[in-house]
């Protein structure tokens, strides 16, 4: 066993050979390398698979041995200072290693099909392989300086991949936005690391945790300075994990290719912030103010993300806000000290969200032959609908992923989210109310995504792309083009003669049933494809979806916990995850009341599932194919018979839509305050520099020139006169200087 741990340092380095080989080939033999570009996917997957096998072996040893291993190399700079670097293998590391490698492998396989047509295929695989290497290095780091080094590499790779299609202005802008926003957090992280080094004289986790255990009883360190440094560390996690108020970069990051969106949201970029807080939780626990701040930021983020996802039309952007909300749940769990629940939700959410993002990529691929390759159209859920007939495999996997994120048992996210809800109610009713209400919102907006995409009719056939006067009832005016007079463009989902609000899916019946227009085709593996209607993607893209579906079904069972009386340090012995995390849980002092009995579990489960089902029902009322039936029965009017109530309900819907679609006006606020404010300050500085500073300099020169021109005639051109005036000036100067 010791022999296995000694070579764990190989795991982050395994993807590097294929990266270097591709770079060598592109530099020296570019033509041959590009012609044979598809073969590079195999070594990328193979090397990461070896890393996965190694990670699984380490995890099994962690479960059996429950030990923490750390290996260090020391580099002595001088007698007073030495730099230590190495790797740390503990339960948290082993969890993250398995998560990164499994999701990374499936994303690589998926990318081979998704990016096969792209000219930047090799560049994409270089970036994504280096992304995996950086994240693996981050989670195995043994000190803060190593974490910061790999932290920056993870950020760099994410910027490269977000702006992968850099010729598109929106992608370039999104890359810049992610960079600038994360600079704020990264600068705070660096200051926090330097502050703790100044306080403790060490960057090693073991030293920081030992000192942290003595802070409260001994009170030997300035608590204000310590709290400030801890806040700066937390600021880095806020930016990286897209927490309020530094969350604005995450939705725009969807401008990158869909596979990288799956990797960022599941196992790398946004997971890095949660990992950092989990790693440093023993440090934060000794600072109650920071713990309260973490839980408060998490609560705000989970609710804000859910509300902003309610009205998004872009399928990837909707999933991005969903990620933001779920990361808020993890942050809340860490803030209330529920270490196991936070990591459990990190695991279950990663596989479910990877399934949803890769499923959305399959949907986008199926829509592109119909609407073109513009993301405004291929990712627009308003143009979709009825896709369950054409891409049934993708539809099934997407449905299960949606139900998992909604918290429907026995799928993965049900177990972890239910644990967070239970712990939040025990910690504070305020947090419990917000978390539970947001769980209902999660079910609503996730099922909304599913219904708009797969339910009803394929609405793209009702759209007018020809820019001619003839066209069906629907037009693309909802995207700000050709908006008819008298129609509120901010609130209309689709412009029809009957007028359809955002909260509806009323599709008028066209002449001739749309099902009669469907050509003969099959969506099974190896099927003949037609471009008249959406078609299922290839096996390379479907295989990862099916594997992730298995994870979504079964990964949640590792955290099922019941208190049967046989516990070890308050941790239920029958729980695989608890046994896995026992050293970390004991170290972070998680209370034993996290274990619950069967009755409490069933009670909590009924409550959370009821909220989820209610959210699903409301979403189906607004967006399901049965909406037309309810509208014909005047069901909604029966609830609001009085016109003032109907008008009030309409105003509320419009306000909610406007808030959600405009991202809570936060981006607008940042643009006006920071972007325009900094631009105005720059213009003011430029005016001061040119008008005042340059004016004084040029004015002094001009005045000197004019005075010189005037007094040069006083001497009459005689040298004796010049000497006389010179001596007079010197005498006057000496007189004032000396007396």
UniProtKB/Swiss-Prot annotation:
Topology in membrane: Multi-pass membrane protein
Gene Ontology annotations for the cellular component aspect, listed alphabetically: chloroplast thylakoid membrane
EC number annotated for this UniProt entry: 7.1.1.-
Keywords, comma-separated and alphabetical: Chloroplast, Membrane, NAD, NADP, Plastid, Plastoquinone, Quinone, Thylakoid, Translocase, Transmembrane, Transmembrane helix, Transport
Keyword Protein biosynthesis: no
Stretches assigned to coiled coil: none
Keyword Membrane annotated: yes
Recorded catalytic activity of this chain's protein: a plastoquinone + NADH + (n+1) H(+)(in) = a plastoquinol + NAD(+) + n H(+)(out); a plastoquinone + NADPH + (n+1) H(+)(in) = a plastoquinol + NADP(+) + n H(+)(out)
GO biological process: ATP synthesis coupled electron transport; electron transport coupled proton transport
Family affiliation: Belongs to the complex I subunit 5 family.
Assembly: NDH is composed of at least 16 different subunits, 5 of which are encoded in the nucleus.
Protein name, as recorded: NAD(P)H-quinone oxidoreductase subunit 5, chloroplastic
